[in-house]
């Protein structure tokens, strides 16, 4: 399972929001490139960037910072936040971004998503941010009547490479992921689901392993890494490649000699 550290960008700095509230932001580091290097050094296999200014304004804003991060590390980088047109996505892919994440546009303009999947195969994922099972849009400022499971099915049919599912009520709260919602979503589609929001401990990460066989292939961790509640290196060791669970027991020795 991929353990994916999140870096939320606001005005060029690494911050965390509480439940998506821009008024409740906490600056963790003035230099996001430094943070990206740290996560790569600790074993991350992918990095998740959110352009918070972009999510609010409807187009990428932190392009210089995103480019600097992509150049500084060798692992794939995925970016979301305000990606609502083809030009914005092409810009990021040209910078070397591995995967772009659309959200609002999936609800408001599904035909554009289909066009994007054809133009940029394997580069388009959809972020489904849900409140009580319904999809939130426009930087979480609005809640639609669209069910998360229905949107996921529609997007899978259009050819997106993955669904990144965030439970807004859990995000930044350290209350643990919503495993029931993740299970329901993964059972409805055949493409990978990446869990996001609420991870507070190593046991939360381990708890998601039970969902791996049905398609939950990764977990995005944000606040818990910055508060120190989760060690990235430990989490990667626990559920990533060569994890504890994959090491066969040593059956060759016996206490009875």
Swiss-Prot record:
Its EC number is 5.3.1.16. It comes from the Bacteria. GO terms for biological process: L-histidine biosynthetic process; L-tryptophan biosynthetic process. The active site is at 8 (proton acceptor), 129 (proton donor). SUPFAM superfamilies: Ribulose-phoshate binding barrel. Belongs to the HisA/HisF family. This is 1-(5-phosphoribosyl)-5-[(5-phosphoribosylamino)methylideneamino] imidazole-4-carboxamide isomerase.
